[in-house]
């Protein structure tokens, strides 16, 4: 029953009652007016509670059908159930290789799957398609030298169609704004560089991730320096 119907019923009830004069009739009209107000207020409150979900069926009690699951959740759930044949690689830096950035795939949290190869410190693309290419390095030093220091990180491609190295991604950072004064306390600094992008690659393309100052690499913790590709 709607609020308007309730009000009409109360008004009809008022008209049906005999018009009593005097204090008793005034009290009756006051009572009916108060009752009408409380009825309207109660109906309004009930509508608000139902509308905003304060009362009624709770979410935990609703059936768990696909209409309540977001499209993104459905996509993630379905993709996790289907084995992927997309090329995937994630290699990590060798902590024992001093003075160079050497990639390893036979380590914890590293992998080569579905045709990707690690050859001559390069990832070899097994099939044509779109790929997410990414890499991260972490530099660490103590104090700032007199000469201006630049740290570079790049991902390059040598394509089958043209045997020339071309930068896909690159970044430059400088950890020092000015030289550390002689005799002053030298403070440690850290500079991470992350690269990532999507590219159309061909079968047989070779990808390399390189830096200019490997002596400043921080290899103390695993997972700080890595390189990988994911077929899309």
Curated annotation (Swiss-Prot):
Gene Ontology CC, one term: plasma membrane
Signal peptide: none
Pfam families: TNF
GO biological process: extrinsic apoptotic signaling pathway via death domain receptors; immune response; necroptotic signaling pathway; negative regulation of protein-containing complex disassembly; positive regulation of apoptotic process; positive regulation of canonical NF-kappaB signal transduction; positive regulation of extrinsic apoptotic signaling pathway; positive regulation of JUN kinase activity
Extracellular side: 56-232
Modified residues (Phosphoserine): 2
Sequence ranges assigned to domain THD in this UniProt record: 87-232
Topology in membrane: Single-pass type II membrane protein
TM stretches of this protein: 35-55
Site feature: Cleavage: 33-34, 38-39, 48-51, 75-76
SUPFAM superfamilies xref list: TNF-like
Disulfide bonds: 144-176
Post-translational modification: The soluble form derives from the membrane form by proteolytic processing. The membrane-bound form is further proteolytically processed by SPPL2A or SPPL2B through regulated intramembrane proteolysis producing TNF intracellular domains (ICD1 and ICD2) released in the cytosol and TNF C-domain 1 and C-domain 2 secreted into the extracellular space. The membrane form, but not the soluble form, is phosphorylated on serine residues. Dephosphorylation of the membrane form occurs by binding to soluble TNFRSF1A/TNFR1.
Subcellular localization, as worded in the UniProt entry: Cell membrane
GO MF assignments: cytokine activity; tumor necrosis factor receptor binding
Record's keyword terms, sorted: Cell membrane, Cytokine, Disulfide bond, Glycoprotein, Lipoprotein, Membrane, Myristate, Phosphoprotein, Secreted, Signal-anchor, Transmembrane, Transmembrane helix
Residues where lipid is bound covalently (N6-myristoyl lysine): 19
Subunit structure: Homotrimer. Interacts with SPPL2B.
Family: Belongs to the tumor necrosis factor family.
Record-given protein name: Tumor necrosis factor
């Amino acid at each position: 029953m709607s609020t308007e119907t309730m009000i009409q019923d109360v008004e009809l009830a008022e008209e049906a009652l005999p018009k009593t004069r005097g204090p008793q009739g005034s009290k009756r009209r006051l009572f009916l007016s108060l009752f009408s107000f409380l009825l309207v207020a109660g109906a309004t409150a009930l509508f608000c509670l139902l509308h905003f979900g304060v009362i009624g069926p709770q979410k935990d009690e609703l059936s768990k059908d696909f209409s309540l699951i977001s499209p993104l959740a459905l996509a993630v759930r379905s993709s996790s159930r289907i084995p992927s044949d997309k090329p995937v690689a994630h290699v990590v830096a060798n902590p024992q290789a001093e003075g160079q950035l050497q990639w390893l795939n036979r380590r914890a949290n590293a992998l080569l799957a579905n045709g990707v190869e690690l050859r001559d410190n390069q990832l070899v693309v097994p099939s044509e398609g779109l790929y997410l290419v990414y890499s991260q390095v972490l530099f660490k030093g103590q104090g700032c030298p007199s000469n201006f220091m630049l740290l570079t990180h790049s991902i390059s491609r040598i394509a089958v169609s043209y045997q020339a190295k071309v930068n896909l991604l690159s970044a430059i950072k400088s950890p020092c704004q000015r030289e550390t004064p002689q005799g002053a306390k030298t403070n440690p600094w850290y500079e991470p560089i992350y690269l990532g992008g999507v590219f159309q690659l061909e079968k047989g393309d070779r990808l390399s991730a390189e830096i200019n100052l490997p002596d400043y690499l921080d290899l103390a913790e695993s997972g700080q320096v890595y390189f990988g590709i994911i077929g899309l």
